[in-house]
Amino acid sequence: MKKFINKVNDIITESLCGFASVHSDLVTLHLDPNFLTRNNKAQNKVAIISGGGSGHEPLHTGYIGYGMLDAACPGHIFTSPSPDQMLAAAEAVHAGKGILFIVKNYAGDVMNFEMAAEMLSFEHEIGRASCRERV
């Protein structure tokens, strides 16, 4: 046996539910769209959000916590999260001091995070700045 998979279509939801139940003291799972947030919403600081394709757990969700991410948006296996996931996560953790998206340099991640940033600027009048650093 190489993998523990009940149903292929449920793998992301089951994985997130398992992670959230094991770390219920730290994170809250939001479904439809899928994203996780810190239990203790940070106040008076810039909200930090990241995400990316699932399949490398606990890559994004494992960085949620004090002094680290406020939210993580896991996409499907090796697929970028949707702009709707990022928008919902941003709305959940925004504390009035701005939002910083940490984006890895994958075309889908860059495109979808940029779309989410544009949606935020239109729907919530949150200013938008862009910085790209090739690493």
Residue ranges and their predicted role:
Residues 34-66, 73:
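Glycine-rich, flexible N-terminal cofactor/catalytic loop recognition
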Residues 56, 60-96, 132:
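Glycine-rich oxoanion-binding loops at beta->alpha junctions
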Residues 110-123:
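Short Gly/Thr/Asp-enriched flexible loops that form oxyanion-binding sites at enzyme active sites
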Residues 125-135:
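Residue-level detector of conserved catalytic or cofactor/ligand-binding positions
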Residues 53-58, 104-113:
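Gly/Ser/Thr-rich loops at beta-strand to alpha-helix junctions
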Residues 35-44, 87-97:
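Glycine-rich phosphate/diphosphate-binding loops that line cofactor/substrate pockets in enzymes
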Residues 97-104:
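A short, small-residue-rich loop immediately preceding and capping a beta-strand
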Residues 1-48:
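N-terminal amphipathic/basic leader segments beginning at the initiator methionine
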